[in-house]
Amino acid sequence: MKPILKIAFIALILVTLFITLVYGYKNWGKPTSSTESINPSEAIHSVSGYAKETILLTPNLEHNFRANNFLIPLKSYGLELSAGNIASKITLDIPLPITIEKFNQKYLYSYISQESGSHIVRYAGKEIKGSEYLDFHDYVLHKDGTFTFMEYVPDLKDRSIHLGLKRVNSLGGVLWSWDSRGHITKEHFVKFSNSLNETNAINEKLPLSEILIQIRKKYSDFVLNVLGVDIYKRLVDIKLHLSNKTYRLFDRYINSVDHIHANSIQYLDNEKYILVSARHLDALFIIEVSTGQIVWSLGGPYSTFTKNRVIGDPRGGFSHQHDAVIYKNRLYLFDNANMFSDLPSRAVVYTFDIKNPNNSRFLFEYLEPYKRRRLSMASVQPLDDDRILIGWGGVPLGPDRQKTSVGASIVNMKNNTTEWQLDFKPGWTSYRARGY
């Protein structure tokens, strides 16, 4: 660390300690809150209809580059509903998972270590070695017991966050990797000014809690030695805001452009290809595993990454999508609709042709039941040929946060009916829904 950064960092620590003593004294002896006291069913406003599957509602996703302008009440645990709509908290061997998936009736989950600030992934209770830049949006568990993870890789030279893909064994040994550099440039970034934009404006005010979390990830040993865990926990509750310029001293990745923001991956054709959903490109693309080349792409109307478009979609395509899935020659995705200011979010289905993306044709859409835009997160999962499970994702700050919101739906495409729906109470949300 450069001398000027050391001085600035120590000064910040001294200031925060002073503020803690002055303003935090009244609460110094009070216990911190615990998710163990939370009843998961308190999040649920209503459940209607019947689901044959067990439904997993995952926690909300957080990562290094996410702005703090969306609700995150489910970040500490997930909900699971049995076929009888009985809600239960998922029991894991850690208190604060931030993502949960389920493979072979076993949970794969991730969290941030309170000791080191590192991103950690566990499957069936065992830690899986990832990488320094591990991203939590999606994983693949292969039949041979290996894993494919996504990475958000910062590049200080061009101030960009690039996409990395790695297939590893349980010990972290790299079996295959791919890097977006050389394939994708940040000039194709489709920026939505009011979205969960990972590039912070220069005048943005950031809460001290966010700053300290970032500092701890970069300088964890120093922070722990100077502050100690207990004092650190007190500091994150202080409502102090510092400017972006101050924040930049302690996070070298601030103001880097997250121009891809991949949020789902799926292997295709016996693992010859990988389908990637790239939210900030308003596009999907397919990588040929053997060559690393992008061999297929499809974009929404605002995408400059590709000229390939869907046929027959009343919107002309999708925007800032999540969770692209191929199932029986159909392409399913969640259209967050960030760039469509007057249209609600939706689940949408197209035909799929791996030889020619321009043959993709609109088949079906299901609009957000309350006609709202859900600007972040969300998921789509085909349960069979006719039924889709939709997780509706984030609720932005504003009037909508004061209302009940739909959390998940099961829709029958054949007759365009809702078979099952769960609504959250105001302020609750989930990253995605999965049926098993």
Model-based region annotation:
Residues F18-Y436:
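Histidine-/acidic-rich catalytic cores in large beta-rich domains
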Residues M1-L14:
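N-terminal Sec-pathway targeting helices
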